[in-house]
Protein backbone atom coordinates (compact mmCIF):
# COMPACT_ATOMS: atom_id res chain seq x y z
CA UNK A 1 0.00 0.00 0.00
CA UNK A 2 1.55 3.27 -1.15
CA UNK A 3 -0.79 5.68 0.65
CA UNK A 4 -1.41 6.53 4.29
CA UNK A 5 -4.18 8.18 6.26
CA UNK A 6 -3.20 10.44 9.17
CA UNK A 7 -5.50 11.22 12.09
CA UNK A 8 -4.50 13.73 14.76
CA UNK A 9 -5.56 16.59 17.01
CA UNK A 10 -4.13 18.88 19.62
CA UNK A 11 -5.62 21.43 21.97
CA UNK A 12 -3.14 24.31 21.76
CA UNK A 13 -3.48 28.07 21.32
CA UNK A 14 -3.50 29.25 17.69
CA UNK A 15 -3.76 33.04 17.75
CA UNK A 16 -4.81 33.65 14.14
CA UNK A 17 -6.75 30.62 12.82
CA UNK A 18 -7.71 32.32 9.54
CA UNK A 19 -4.12 33.06 8.51
CA UNK A 20 -2.94 29.66 9.78
CA UNK A 21 -5.66 27.89 7.76
CA UNK A 22 -4.77 29.71 4.53
CA UNK A 23 -1.05 29.00 4.86
CA UNK A 24 -1.69 25.40 5.92
CA UNK A 25 -3.97 24.77 2.94
CA UNK A 26 -1.26 26.06 0.60
CA UNK A 27 1.31 23.67 2.11
CA UNK A 28 -1.08 20.70 1.89
CA UNK A 29 -1.93 21.35 -1.75
CA UNK A 30 1.73 21.78 -2.67
CA UNK A 31 2.34 18.31 -1.24
CA UNK A 32 -0.67 16.67 -2.95
CA UNK A 33 -2.47 15.94 0.32
CA UNK A 34 -6.24 15.54 0.61
CA UNK A 35 -8.41 15.68 3.71
CA UNK A 36 -10.23 17.83 6.26
CA UNK A 37 -8.55 20.00 8.88
CA UNK A 38 -10.32 22.26 11.37
CA UNK A 39 -8.42 25.10 13.01
CA UNK A 40 -9.50 27.23 15.96
CA UNK A 41 -8.02 29.39 18.67
CA UNK A 42 -8.32 26.23 20.82
CA UNK A 43 -6.27 23.97 18.51
CA UNK A 44 -6.25 21.77 15.43
CA UNK A 45 -8.17 18.63 14.40
CA UNK A 46 -7.24 16.88 11.19
CA UNK A 47 -7.39 13.79 9.04
CA UNK A 48 -5.72 13.60 5.65
CA UNK A 49 -4.30 11.18 3.12
CA UNK A 50 -1.33 11.08 0.78
CA UNK A 51 1.63 9.01 -0.30
CA UNK A 52 4.09 7.84 2.33
CA UNK A 53 6.59 10.43 1.10
CA UNK A 54 4.09 13.31 1.22
CA UNK A 55 2.64 12.34 4.62
CA UNK A 56 6.17 12.06 6.02
CA UNK A 57 6.82 15.62 4.83
CA UNK A 58 3.60 16.74 6.51
CA UNK A 59 4.53 15.11 9.82
CA UNK A 60 7.99 16.69 9.62
CA UNK A 61 6.44 20.09 8.84
CA UNK A 62 4.11 19.88 11.85
CA UNK A 63 6.77 18.69 14.28
CA UNK A 64 9.00 21.59 13.23
CA UNK A 65 6.42 23.98 14.72
CA UNK A 66 6.95 24.29 18.48
CA UNK A 67 3.17 24.21 19.04
CA UNK A 68 2.97 20.74 17.49
CA UNK A 69 6.40 19.32 18.38
CA UNK A 70 4.84 16.53 20.47
CA UNK A 71 1.84 15.93 18.17
CA UNK A 72 0.87 12.24 17.94
CA UNK A 73 -0.27 10.91 14.56
CA UNK A 74 -2.42 7.82 14.19
CA UNK A 75 -1.44 6.22 10.88
CA UNK A 76 -3.33 3.77 8.66
CA UNK A 77 -2.04 2.20 5.46
CA UNK A 78 -4.30 2.76 2.43
CA UNK A 79 -4.44 1.79 -1.23
CA UNK A 80 -5.31 5.30 -2.43
CA UNK A 81 -6.43 8.72 -1.24
CA UNK A 82 -9.18 8.55 1.40
CA UNK A 83 -10.52 11.99 0.45
CA UNK A 84 -11.46 13.74 -2.78
CA UNK A 85 -10.35 17.27 -1.88
CA UNK A 86 -8.26 19.24 0.62
CA UNK A 87 -10.02 21.55 3.07
CA UNK A 88 -8.53 23.57 5.93
CA UNK A 89 -11.23 25.60 7.67
CA UNK A 90 -11.17 28.04 10.60
CA UNK A 91 -13.87 27.22 13.16
CA UNK A 92 -15.06 28.36 16.59
CA UNK A 93 -14.41 24.84 17.94
CA UNK A 94 -12.31 21.99 16.56
CA UNK A 95 -15.05 19.60 17.67
CA UNK A 96 -18.59 20.95 17.96
CA UNK A 97 -20.06 20.39 21.42
CA UNK A 98 -21.70 23.85 21.51
CA UNK A 99 -21.81 24.18 25.30
CA UNK A 100 -23.19 27.30 26.95
CA UNK A 101 -19.97 27.40 28.96
CA UNK A 102 -17.14 25.95 26.91
CA UNK A 103 -14.74 23.37 28.35
CA UNK A 104 -10.98 23.76 28.04
CA UNK A 105 -9.52 20.22 28.06
CA UNK A 106 -6.15 21.64 29.06
CA UNK A 107 -7.76 22.68 32.35
CA UNK A 108 -10.42 20.01 32.96
CA UNK A 109 -10.73 16.56 31.39
CA UNK A 110 -11.22 12.95 32.43
CA UNK A 111 -8.41 10.63 33.50
CA UNK A 112 -6.51 9.14 30.58
CA UNK A 113 -6.76 5.36 30.26
CA UNK A 114 -4.06 3.51 28.32
CA UNK A 115 -5.27 0.65 26.08
CA UNK A 116 -4.24 -1.82 28.81
CA UNK A 117 -6.14 0.13 31.48
CA UNK A 118 -9.17 0.47 29.21
CA UNK A 119 -9.19 -3.30 28.61
CA UNK A 120 -9.28 -3.78 32.39
CA UNK A 121 -12.17 -1.29 32.61
CA UNK A 122 -14.08 -3.32 30.00
CA UNK A 123 -13.68 -6.34 32.28
CA UNK A 124 -14.75 -4.46 35.44
CA UNK A 125 -18.41 -4.92 36.41
CA UNK A 126 -18.39 -1.64 38.36
CA UNK A 127 -17.36 0.44 35.35
CA UNK A 128 -19.75 1.89 32.76
CA UNK A 129 -18.34 2.23 29.24
CA UNK A 130 -19.99 5.12 27.40
CA UNK A 131 -19.68 5.53 23.62
CA UNK A 132 -19.27 9.24 22.83
CA UNK A 133 -19.99 8.80 19.11
CA UNK A 134 -23.17 8.99 17.05
CA UNK A 135 -25.69 6.16 16.85
CA UNK A 136 -24.80 5.18 13.27
CA UNK A 137 -21.14 4.87 14.30
CA UNK A 138 -22.09 2.63 17.23
CA UNK A 139 -24.33 0.47 15.04
CA UNK A 140 -21.44 -0.45 12.75
CA UNK A 141 -19.12 -1.35 15.62
CA UNK A 142 -18.55 -0.74 19.34
CA UNK A 143 -16.93 -2.10 22.48
CA UNK A 144 -18.79 -5.02 23.98
CA UNK A 145 -21.26 -3.86 26.64
CA UNK A 146 -20.86 -0.14 25.88
CA UNK A 147 -23.84 2.18 26.30
CA UNK A 148 -25.29 3.50 23.03
CA UNK A 149 -26.49 7.12 23.29
CA UNK A 150 -29.41 7.74 20.94
CA UNK A 151 -27.86 10.73 19.13
CA UNK A 152 -26.97 11.70 15.56
CA UNK A 153 -24.83 14.73 16.49
CA UNK A 154 -22.08 15.06 19.10
CA UNK A 155 -23.58 18.31 20.42
CA UNK A 156 -26.67 16.36 21.54
CA UNK A 157 -24.67 14.12 23.91
CA UNK A 158 -24.87 16.37 27.02
CA UNK A 159 -28.67 16.46 26.79
CA UNK A 160 -28.76 12.67 26.42
CA UNK A 161 -26.63 12.31 29.57
CA UNK A 162 -28.93 14.60 31.56
CA UNK A 163 -31.94 12.56 30.44
CA UNK A 164 -30.27 9.25 31.31
CA UNK A 165 -28.36 10.06 34.50
CA UNK A 166 -29.63 6.94 36.23
CA UNK A 167 -27.40 4.82 33.96
CA UNK A 168 -24.31 6.71 35.12
CA UNK A 169 -24.85 7.94 38.68
CA UNK A 170 -22.51 6.38 41.23
CA UNK A 171 -20.55 4.46 38.61
CA UNK A 172 -17.01 4.61 37.30
CA UNK A 173 -17.46 6.14 33.84
CA UNK A 174 -15.01 5.60 30.99
CA UNK A 175 -15.84 7.10 27.62
CA UNK A 176 -14.35 6.52 24.17
CA UNK A 177 -14.49 7.85 20.60
CA UNK A 178 -12.66 7.37 17.30
CA UNK A 179 -9.38 9.18 17.92
CA UNK A 180 -9.87 10.73 21.36
CA UNK A 181 -10.73 14.35 20.56
CA UNK A 182 -14.44 14.20 21.39
CA UNK A 183 -13.71 12.59 24.76
CA UNK A 184 -11.22 15.30 25.76
CA UNK A 185 -14.00 17.87 25.96
CA UNK A 186 -16.90 15.53 26.77
CA UNK A 187 -15.16 13.86 29.74
CA UNK A 188 -14.29 17.34 31.05
CA UNK A 189 -17.96 18.25 30.81
CA UNK A 190 -18.89 15.10 32.78
CA UNK A 191 -16.46 16.12 35.53
CA UNK A 192 -17.90 19.64 35.58
CA UNK A 193 -21.42 18.18 35.83
CA UNK A 194 -20.41 16.48 39.08
CA UNK A 195 -19.78 12.91 37.92
CA UNK A 196 -16.93 11.29 39.83
CA UNK A 197 -14.33 8.83 38.56
CA UNK A 198 -14.53 9.90 34.91
CA UNK A 199 -12.02 8.46 32.43
CA UNK A 200 -11.37 8.40 28.69
CA UNK A 201 -9.60 6.03 26.30
CA UNK A 202 -6.41 7.92 25.42
CA UNK A 203 -5.96 8.01 21.65
CA UNK A 204 -9.39 6.53 21.06
CA UNK A 205 -10.42 3.33 19.31
CA UNK A 206 -7.76 3.89 16.64
CA UNK A 207 -4.98 3.57 19.23
CA UNK A 208 -6.60 0.65 21.07
CA UNK A 209 -6.90 -1.37 17.86
CA UNK A 210 -3.22 -1.00 17.04
CA UNK A 211 -1.91 -1.63 20.56
CA UNK A 212 0.33 -4.75 20.49
CA UNK A 213 -1.02 -5.96 23.84
CA UNK A 214 -4.77 -5.37 23.55
CA UNK A 215 -5.01 -5.97 19.77
CA UNK A 216 -8.54 -4.55 19.72
CA UNK A 217 -9.95 -7.23 22.04
CA UNK A 218 -13.65 -6.81 23.02
CA UNK A 219 -14.39 -4.67 19.96
CA UNK A 220 -17.29 -5.99 17.86
CA UNK A 221 -17.83 -4.96 14.23
CA UNK A 222 -15.90 -2.24 12.40
CA UNK A 223 -14.97 1.34 13.25
CA UNK A 224 -16.77 4.03 11.28
CA UNK A 225 -14.42 6.63 9.77
CA UNK A 226 -15.31 9.94 8.14
CA UNK A 227 -13.63 9.41 4.79
CA UNK A 228 -13.98 7.40 1.58
CA UNK A 229 -13.07 4.15 3.37
CA UNK A 230 -16.24 4.38 5.55
CA UNK A 231 -14.97 1.70 7.95
CA UNK A 232 -11.80 -0.02 9.18
CA UNK A 233 -11.01 -3.13 11.24
CA UNK A 234 -10.16 -2.85 14.95
CA UNK A 235 -10.22 -6.31 16.55
CA UNK A 236 -7.16 -8.30 15.44
CA UNK A 237 -8.14 -11.39 17.45
CA UNK A 238 -11.85 -12.10 17.05
CA UNK A 239 -13.55 -10.31 14.16
CA UNK A 240 -17.34 -10.13 14.17
CA UNK A 241 -20.03 -8.44 12.08
CA UNK A 242 -22.71 -6.71 14.15
CA UNK A 243 -24.18 -4.30 11.62
CA UNK A 244 -27.66 -5.26 10.40
CA UNK A 245 -28.93 -4.73 6.87
CA UNK A 246 -31.58 -2.01 6.75
CA UNK A 247 -34.18 -4.06 4.87
CA UNK A 248 -33.67 -7.72 5.78
CA UNK A 249 -31.65 -7.62 9.01
CA UNK A 250 -28.83 -9.82 7.73
CA UNK A 251 -25.23 -9.08 8.81
CA UNK A 252 -23.95 -6.06 6.90
CA UNK A 253 -21.09 -3.54 7.10
CA UNK A 254 -21.82 -1.56 3.92
CA UNK A 255 -22.96 2.01 4.61
CA UNK A 256 -24.56 4.26 1.99
CA UNK A 257 -26.35 7.59 2.15
CA UNK A 258 -30.04 7.54 1.27
CA UNK A 259 -30.44 8.59 -2.38
CA UNK A 260 -32.96 11.28 -1.46
CA UNK A 261 -30.81 14.44 -1.17
CA UNK A 262 -33.27 15.88 1.36
CA UNK A 263 -32.84 12.82 3.61
CA UNK A 264 -29.24 11.62 3.21
CA UNK A 265 -29.69 9.20 6.13
CA UNK A 266 -26.89 6.67 6.51
CA UNK A 267 -28.09 3.09 6.22
CA UNK A 268 -26.43 -0.32 6.11
CA UNK A 269 -27.43 -1.89 2.79
CA UNK A 270 -26.25 -4.79 0.65
CA UNK A 271 -25.46 -4.12 -3.02
CA UNK A 272 -28.44 -6.28 -3.98
CA UNK A 273 -30.89 -4.31 -1.84
CA UNK A 274 -29.42 -0.96 -2.86
CA UNK A 275 -30.36 -1.87 -6.42
CA UNK A 276 -33.70 -3.37 -5.42
CA UNK A 277 -34.80 -0.36 -3.35
CA UNK A 278 -33.26 2.38 -5.53
CA UNK A 279 -30.59 3.37 -3.00
CA UNK A 280 -33.21 4.78 -0.63
CA UNK A 281 -34.10 4.18 3.02
CA UNK A 282 -37.87 4.18 2.39
CA UNK A 283 -40.61 4.26 -0.24
CA UNK A 284 -41.06 8.00 0.26
CA UNK A 285 -37.37 8.60 -0.43
CA UNK A 286 -37.21 6.13 -3.33
CA UNK A 287 -39.97 7.99 -5.20
CA UNK A 288 -38.43 11.43 -4.54
CA UNK A 289 -38.15 13.36 -7.80
CA UNK A 290 -34.43 14.01 -7.23
CA UNK A 291 -33.46 10.44 -6.30
CA UNK A 292 -29.70 10.35 -6.94
CA UNK A 293 -29.58 6.61 -7.57
CA UNK A 294 -32.20 6.88 -10.31
CA UNK A 295 -30.34 9.75 -11.96
CA UNK A 296 -26.90 8.13 -11.66
CA UNK A 297 -28.06 4.85 -13.20
CA UNK A 298 -30.32 6.43 -15.85
CA UNK A 299 -33.31 4.39 -14.70
CA UNK A 300 -36.42 4.77 -16.86
CA UNK A 301 -39.76 5.81 -15.36
CA UNK A 302 -41.13 2.35 -16.10
CA UNK A 303 -38.27 0.62 -14.27
CA UNK A 304 -38.51 3.16 -11.45
CA UNK A 305 -42.15 2.26 -10.88
CA UNK A 306 -41.38 -1.45 -11.06
CA UNK A 307 -38.75 -1.20 -8.30
CA UNK A 308 -41.00 0.97 -6.15
CA UNK A 309 -43.32 -2.03 -5.97
CA UNK A 310 -40.56 -3.89 -4.08
CA UNK A 311 -41.44 -1.82 -1.02
CA UNK A 312 -44.65 -3.83 -0.68
CA UNK A 313 -42.42 -6.55 0.81
CA UNK A 314 -41.12 -4.18 3.51
CA UNK A 315 -44.14 -2.16 4.72
CA UNK A 316 -42.18 -0.94 7.77
CA UNK A 317 -40.03 1.14 5.38
CA UNK A 318 -42.86 3.04 3.69
CA UNK A 319 -41.83 6.32 5.31
CA UNK A 320 -38.42 7.81 6.09
Swiss-Prot record:
Active-site residue list: 177 (cysteine persulfide intermediate)
Domain of life: Bacteria
Keywords, alphabetical: Oxidoreductase, tRNA processing
Pfam families for this protein: Rhodanese, Rhodanese_C, UPF0176_N
EC numbers on record: 1.14.-.-
InterPro entries for this protein: Rhodanese-like_dom, Rhodanese-like_dom_sf, Rhodanese_C, TrhO, TRHO_N
Keyword tRNA processing: yes
Protein name: tRNA uridine(34) hydroxylase
Organism: Staphylococcus epidermidis (strain ATCC 35984 / DSM 28319 / BCRC 17069 / CCUG 31568 / BM 3577 / RP62A)
Gene responsible for this protein: trhO
Amino acid sequence: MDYRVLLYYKYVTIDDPETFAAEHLKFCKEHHLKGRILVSTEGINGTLSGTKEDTDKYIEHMHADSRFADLTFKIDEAESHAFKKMHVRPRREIVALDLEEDINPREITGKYYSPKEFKAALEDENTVILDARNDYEYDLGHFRGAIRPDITRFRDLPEWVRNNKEQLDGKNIVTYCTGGIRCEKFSGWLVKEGFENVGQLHGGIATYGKDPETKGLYWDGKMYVFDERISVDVNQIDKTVIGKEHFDGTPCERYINCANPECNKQILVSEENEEKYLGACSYDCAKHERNRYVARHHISNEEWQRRLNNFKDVPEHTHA
